[in-house]
Each structure stands twice: as C-alpha cells, then as structure tokens.
UniProtKB/Swiss-Prot annotation:
This is Protein LSM12. It comes from Xenopus laevis. It is found in: Cytoplasm. One of its GO terms (cellular component) is cytoplasm. Nicotinic acid adenine dinucleotide phosphate (NAADP) binding protein. InterPro entries: AD, Lsm12-like, LSM12_ABD, LSM12_LSM, Sm. It comes from the Eukaryota.
Length: 194
C-alpha cells in the first residue's frame, strides 16, 4: 500500500488483493492519498471489448498492492469541457425542477403533473400558467386536464397535443388495469395460451 509520500501514478498498472481475498488488476485512473481511495480501470465484467469497469478501492481494505507496470510517458490530457453547454444544461435542469416545484406548490393534481411531464418529453415548449398547462403558447389545458379541456386555435398544434393527452390517459388506465388485477391478467394469458 502507498506509504507516507507515496502515490500511484495515473496510467500505472497495479494488482492488489481485497479483504475478501479477491485479486484485482487494472490501470490506475485516479488516486486520492488523504482518503486512500484508488480508482482502477479493469476489463469489462460484461465481456464487451470496448467497455471497462471502474472500481473504487479503499486501500484500508486492500493488501498486497503491487505495481506491475509503471507508466513512463505522461498521461493523455483530459478532454476539454464545453462550459457553455454544461451551464445551459444546468440552467434547463433547474428550470424543469422549479416548474415541478411550482406545480406542487400551486396545488396541481397528480394527474396534471404527470400529464405535464408526458407532454414535456415530446414538446419542450410547455410551461405552467397558474394551474393551466400552456403548450407552445398555442394550446392551454385546464383542470381536470382531459382532452375536452384542451383549448387553442384549430390546427396541427391543438390536434397533436390532444393526441398526446388522449394517449397519456389511455396509458394510465392500462397501467391501472394491470396493477389492479395481475392474477386475473396472468390467468387470462394462461387460458388463451392453452
């Protein structure tokens, strides 16, 4: 194990034995001396050639650590991060969470919240306006959020949103039917297969 002042170089290949007597070998991808945590990149347990397992090892529970191959050249540079893209993604995630929180605090029913999430998966341009769902600034769905509660200018947008609402509630009903009576469902499947 790494003693005082010792460390594992990124890219080195090491072998160690865990407290469960399992032998692990892999390439060092990270090492934190204060916490004695070692991250190893090992061949994939799924057997896929282009995949790898990353194992985090607490060196307090590892013995017999041996450096098999020390890295001689400098490790490749880290990939650059697109800070603008990351900031945009974080902003969008925050807006979505705030929208969900708004719906809950406004007293929107669970059906309304679920419908909003279903619509939002397909059409990102949807928002809350008090207890109403506004889609693409063209369609307004008011409580109790059924197809007949969809209002807007006749056209493709209204038709599309109505289809999403209709499918959402059909899927919810199908889910309830399956959850209500799984025994009857399995008996029905058995009787039709015989």
């Amino acid at each position: 194990m790494a003693g005082p002042g010792e460390y594992f170089a990124i890219g080195a290949y090491v072998s160690c034995r865990t407290c469960q007597e399992t032998r692990l070998q892999g390439e060092v991808v990270a090492f934190d001396y204060p916490s004695k945590m070692l991250a190893l990149k090992c061949p994939s347990s799924s057997g896929k050639a282009n995949h790898a397992d990353i194992l985090l090892l607490n060196l307090d529970y590892v013995s017999d650590v041996e450096v098999i191959n020390e890295r001689t050249q400098t490790p490749p540079p880290l990939a650059s991060l697109n800070i603008t893209k990351l900031a945009s993604r974080a902003r969008l995630e925050k807006e979505e969470k705030l929208s969900q929180a708004y719906a809950i605090s406004a007293g929107v029913s669970l059906d309304g919240q679920q419908l909003f999430q279903t619509i939002h998966k397909t059409i990102k341009d949807c928002k809350w306006q008090e207890k109403n769902i506004v889609v693409m600034d063209e369609v307004v769905i008011s409580p109790p959020y059924q197809v007949e509660n969809c209002k807007g200018k006749e056209g493709r947008a209204l038709t599309h949103v109505c289809k999403i609402v209709e499918k959402h509630f059909r899927d919810v009903e199908n889910q309830k039917g399956v959850q209500r009576n799984p025994v009857a469902q399995s008996q029905k499947e058995t009787s039709t297969s015989s």
